[in-house]
Amino acid sequence: MGLSDAEWQLVLNVWGKVEADLAGHGQEVLIRLFHTHPETLEKFDKFKHLKSEDEMKASEDLKKHGNTVLTALGAILKKKGHHEAEIKPLAQSHATKHKIPVKYLEFISEAIIHVLHSKHPGDFGADAQAAMSKALELFRNDIAAQYKELGFQG
C-alpha cells in the first residue's frame, strides 16, 4: 500500500503550495468538513456554536486549528510513510481525549482532496489526487492500527 517515489513527489509538490498558507487551507478544510458532515462539528466544543459558513470564516480559533491540523499532517506526509513517531501521539490524543472515529478521518481526507483540487487545479490533477488519496489512506490505516492497540473502537 506504500507510495512510489514519484507518488510521494506529487504529494509533496502540492503540499508546498499548502504550506504557503496553512491557516487558510486548514480553515477551508474544516469548513468543508463541517459543511459536508455536520455531525463532526459535535467533536469540537470550541466550534459547536459556529452555525454558518460566515461565522466559521470569521473565527480566528477555527483558522488556528486548521493551521494545527495541516502542520501535523505536513510533518507526517514529509516522512513518506515512515511516520510512526508522529502517528503515535496523534492516535493517542485522538483516541483517548478527543474520541475521533476513523470514519471522521476519512471525511477530513475527502475535504482535503476537495480543497486542494479547488485551490490548486493546475498542480492537483488526477495523478496528484490519486497519490494524495493513497497517502491519506496510509495515514488513516496507521492511525486505525494505533487505535486498535489502544483498545479504541473508533
From Swiss-Prot:
Summarize subunit and interaction data from the UniProt record for this chain.
Monomeric.
Q: Which residues bind nitrite?
A: 65
Q: Where does O2 bind?
A: 65
GO cellular component annotations, sorted alphabetically? extracellular exosome; sarcoplasm
Top EC class per UniProt?
A: oxidoreductase
**Purpose:** Monomeric heme protein which primary function is to store oxygen and facilitate its diffusion within muscle tissues. Reversibly binds oxygen through a pentacoordinated heme iron and enables its timely and efficient release as needed during periods of heightened demand. Depending on the oxidative conditions of tissues and cells, and in addition to its ability to bind oxygen, it also has a nitrite reductase activity whereby it regulates the production of bioactive nitric oxide.
Grouped into one coarse class, the protein's main location is cytoplasm
Positions bearing Phosphothreonine: 68
Gene, per the UniProt record: MB
Tell me the Gene Ontology biological-process terms attached to this UniProt entry: removal of superoxide radicals
- What positions does the entry give for heme b binding? 94
- What name appears for this protein in its UniProt entry? Myoglobin
Output the SUPFAM superfamilies linked to this UniProt entry: Globin-like
What is the organism field in this record? Oryctolagus cuniculus
Annotated family: Belongs to the globin family.
CDD domains registered for this protein in UniProt: Mb
* Subcellular compartments: Cytoplasm, Sarcoplasm
This entry's Gene Ontology molecular function terms read: heme binding; metal ion binding; nitrite reductase activity; oxygen binding; oxygen carrier activity; peroxidase activity
Q: Which PANTHER family match?
A: MYOGLOBIN
